[in-house]
Design a protein with these regions (language model features):
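PAPS-dependent sulfotransferases, especially Golgi type II membrane carbohydrate sulfotransferases
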Residues: 1-113, 256-304, 309-389
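PAPS-dependent sulfation machinery
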Residues: 82, 121, 128, 138-199, ...
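Long, mid-chain structured domain cores
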Residues: 90-148, 152-154
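Hydrophobic/aromatic beta-strand patches that form the interior of the parallel beta-sheet core
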Residues: 123, 213-216, 303-305
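Short, solvent-exposed loop/turn segments at secondary-structure junctions
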Residues: 130-131, 153-155, 196-199, 220-224, ...
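A short acidic (Asp/Glu
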Residues: 135, 200-206, 225-229, 314-318
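Short hydrophobic/aromatic-enriched beta-strand-loop microsegments
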Residues: 148-150, 212-219, 238, 330
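Conserved phosphate-donor/acceptor-positioning beta-strand/loop module used by diverse small-molecule
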Residues: 208-230, 321
Length: 389
């Protein structure tokens, strides 16, 4: 029997177990975290309660495993700062993990009762994606006692589940968040910057994490679409596909899987007639904007933030955001200047290429799609709750 099969059988057991990591598999950074990111050795039963009490700062929640009804933690060597090793937290976890711990959900829930339960110092950052939200997390670190975590993938898993299943996991998500906070933030503020698609589960997270404050960041639709395309395919490939007419094909033909609808739910509405990559990423932008608008009106966001405002007036925008969030830290101009002077995702495959591939025809297609929406019908629409004076 191969080692991964032995490991999988152990994951189905009821007790906590620790697995040595024999190998890390190469994963695209768009991949969602999973135990399958690793080749695991033979497991050893463990007392996870004691292990956590001995050294909680080397253990962080990595992902859920629904089949075994476990929360999986990665263990790293002492002194590793997962918030600085890589622009994305889930990638830092994968790169630095030395062991994987499988902890049954009942044990997780029981242990969480002994963790500090307050979530008033927790900030949830939702966004359209490709809009400067990673930069925002770096700017927030200039606000005194703040730990920022960029894209912990535990939350990304929720979009792959039916709404009811995600709701049933709310207690586990809350417990996992308390573990993450206890491991990284101790008693200070913690900001969790989610992948853009997690916006579709913003209401569920607000219910699971009472006291946390949510913000939403966005950007001009054409800039977001352009940035997504240039990180997904080489510019020459997109231009070639456009010249060959592939961009005129319906998006549902090019991306027919159910997972596509999870990324851009409004694609289910055939009246939009989306075509090509431009159509897909326009509908993804619109879907997230619609989800954020609904959340703002039904639950309430602490603030909405436009990338253009942040770039135009970073100091003033950050001051207003700090006020909206109740932060007490002082601005550090040198740290602000340093963060603004580099690509926040430098070192990852998602780093911006700074290339414009959309032409005037593409932007007209984008505007025609948006024109179908009753409220979000302009690429530079401004959401309520903004921070601009």
């Amino acid at each position: 029997m191969h080692e991964p099969e032995v490991a999988w059988l152990a994951l189905e057991q009821e007790n906590a177990a620790a697995f040595p990591i024999l190998r890390r598999f190469s994963r695209n950074e768009r991949h969602t975290a999973s135990w399958q990111d690793f080749q695991l050795g033979r497991p050893e039963a463990e007392d996870f309660i004691r292990r956590w009490r001995d050294d909680p700062h080397t253990l962080t929640p990595y992902c859920l495993d629904r089949r075994s009804r476990s929360l999986l933690f990665v263990e790293t060597a002492p002194g590793v700062d997962l918030c600085t090793v890589h622009p994305f937290f889930y990638q830092a976890q994968r790169l630095c993990a030395i062991r994987l711990h499988s902890v049954p959900m009942p044990v997780v829930l029981a242990m969480a009762r002994d963790l500090p339960a307050t979530l008033e110092q927790l900030i949830l950052i939702h966004s359209t994606g490709r809009c400067g939200s990673t930069l925002l997390t770096q700017l927030l670190q200039t606000q005194g006692d703040m730990v920022t975590v960029s894209e912990p993938d535990l939350y990304t898993q929720l979009i792959h589940l039916p709404q009811q299943d995600a709701l049933e996991l709310a207690p586990v998500i809350r417990a996992a968040t308390l573990f993450l906070r206890a491991s990284l933030a101790r008693n200070g503020y913690m900001a969790l910057k989610m992948r853009g698609v997690v916006t579709y589960r913003a209401a569920m997270l607000a219910e699971a994490l009472p006291g946390a404050r949510s913000i939403f960041m966005y950007r001009h639709a054409a800039d977001v679409v352009n940035s997504f395309i240039t990180t997904m395919v080489p510019p020459w490939q997109f231009r070639l596909e456009r010249a060959l007419g592939i961009e005129r094909l319906p998006t549902r033909w090019l991306m027919p899987s159910q997972s596509t609808l999870r990324l851009a739910p409004l694609l289910a509405d055939r009246s939009y007639q989306a075509t090509g990559l431009v159509g897909f990423f326009t509908m993804a932008w619109l879907s997230k904007m619609e989800a954020a608008l609904a959340f703002q009106e039904q639950v309430g966001l602490a603030a909405t933030l436009r990338y253009e405002a942040l770039r135009r007036d970073p100091g003033g925008t950050l001051e207003r955001l700090a006020t909206a969030l109740g932060l007490a830290g002082d601005l550090q101009p040198a740290a602000l200047e340093k963060a603004l002077g580099k690509d926040a995702q430098q070192g990852s495959s998602m780093a911006s290429r700074q290339v414009r591939v959309l032409d005037q025809h593409d932007e007209r297609r984008l505007r025609r799609l948006l024109a179908h929406h009753p409220r979000l019908n302009q690429p530079d629409v401004v959401l309520p709750g903004g921070l601009e004076p």
